[in-house]
Amino acid sequence: MSLINWFEEKRKFGGLIGAFIEKATKGYVLSEREKDRYINVDTNKGLWTRCDNCENMLYIKFLKQNKGVCEECGYHLQINSTERIELLIDRDTWIPMDEDMVAQDVLKFSDEDSYRNRISLSQKRTGLTDAVQTGIGNLNGTPVALGVMDFQSMGGSMGSVVGEKITRLIEYATQESLPLIIVCASGGARMQEGTLSSMQMAKISSVSQIHQVQKKLLYIAVLTYPTTGGVTASFGMLGDIIIAEPKAYIAFAGKRVIEQTLRQKIPDGFQVAESLFDHGLLDSIVPRNLLKGVLSEIFELYDLAPWKEKNNQV
């Protein structure tokens, strides 16, 4: 039996969520054949993962081939920053920037663990110095400046390094007249850095104003699950065009915080991308497998803008 046929058979029996789980919870004894069809999550952690939406078990190899999208329900699972760069940038054109920039524990912050240890563990686990990768590359032949946040690194939180790397990226894009793309995935400002983290919001917004308003260069913000806090309150919502992935969680404060502040019940799903789109806060919701093509078409239209031709003649 081929791997694909085996995989299809597993799907038929038990829906990839541990076959016959309803019977098992009622004291039902599995036959030898049923046990063979049962997928044990604990013993197959390197091969399988669970969809956060439909809870079906997904074979990781096939999931990666599908760009991190659940083939059962279409839910967009989180992917890391390197995978996003490979998804958007043409092969062998990526030039990273500021890879050696590392956060300093200026406040000597410590809660359950020291900030220094948290950074060290995150670097070992992800292979990244901090929660964003920035650089230059081609998107279907168009040179772009790209920043990609990584939620797996310190929850994608925005500290001094994240803010400085994005600031330098925007300044370079402004200097070289490049369009800018920032893919957001963040829990907000990094609390371990206090005011040093909060000030990054204003710093990034100020250089973005020069890039967009003074130089009339294009900035596209791509919001993914999750985009929250200080990132939403600054460059996440400053794009000339704001795109989100389907069902992405986008918010400033969490639902419980809002309910406790307003003292009223908030409807479910009001912080999901589809709800924000319905209320005019997003320009488009684009599935992950179509994103590169959509961005490419936007850049083609941008190149044909009449005001851009006038600027080139001056």
Curated annotation (Swiss-Prot):
A zinc finger (C4-type) spans 51-73. The keyword Protein transport does not apply. Signal peptide: none annotated. It is an enzyme of class 2 (transferase). Its EC number is 2.1.3.15. It is found in: Plastid, Chloroplast stroma. Residues 47-314 form the CoA carboxyltransferase N-terminal domain. Pfam families: Carboxyl_trans. Keywords: ATP-binding, Chloroplast, Fatty acid biosynthesis, Fatty acid metabolism, Lipid biosynthesis, Lipid metabolism, Metal-binding, Nucleotide-binding, Plastid, Transferase, Zinc, Zinc-finger. Zn(2+) binds at residues 51, 54, 70, 73. Binds 1 zinc ion per subunit. Gene3D superfamilies: 2-enoyl-CoA Hydratase, Chain A, domain 1. Its cofactor is Zn(2+). GO terms for biological process: fatty acid biosynthetic process; malonyl-CoA biosynthetic process. Its main location: plastid. One of its GO terms (molecular function) is ATP binding. It catalyses: N(6)-carboxybiotinyl-L-lysyl-[protein] + acetyl-CoA = N(6)-biotinyl-L-lysyl-[protein] + malonyl-CoA. Pathway: Lipid metabolism; malonyl-CoA biosynthesis; malonyl-CoA from acetyl-CoA: step 1/1. One of its GO terms (cellular component) is chloroplast stroma. Component of the acetyl coenzyme A carboxylase (ACC) complex. Biotin carboxylase (BC) catalyzes the carboxylation of biotin on its carrier protein (BCCP) and then the CO(2) group is transferred by the transcarboxylase to acetyl-CoA to form malonyl-CoA. Belongs to the AccD/PCCB family. Acetyl-CoA carboxylase is a heterohexamer composed of biotin carboxyl carrier protein, biotin carboxylase and 2 subunits each of ACCase subunit alpha and ACCase plastid-coded subunit beta (accD). NCBIfam families: accD. This is Acetyl-coenzyme A carboxylase carboxyl transferase subunit beta, chloroplastic. It comes from Angiopteris lygodiifolia (Turnip fern). The lineage of its organism: Eukaryota, Viridiplantae, Streptophyta, Embryophyta, Tracheophyta.
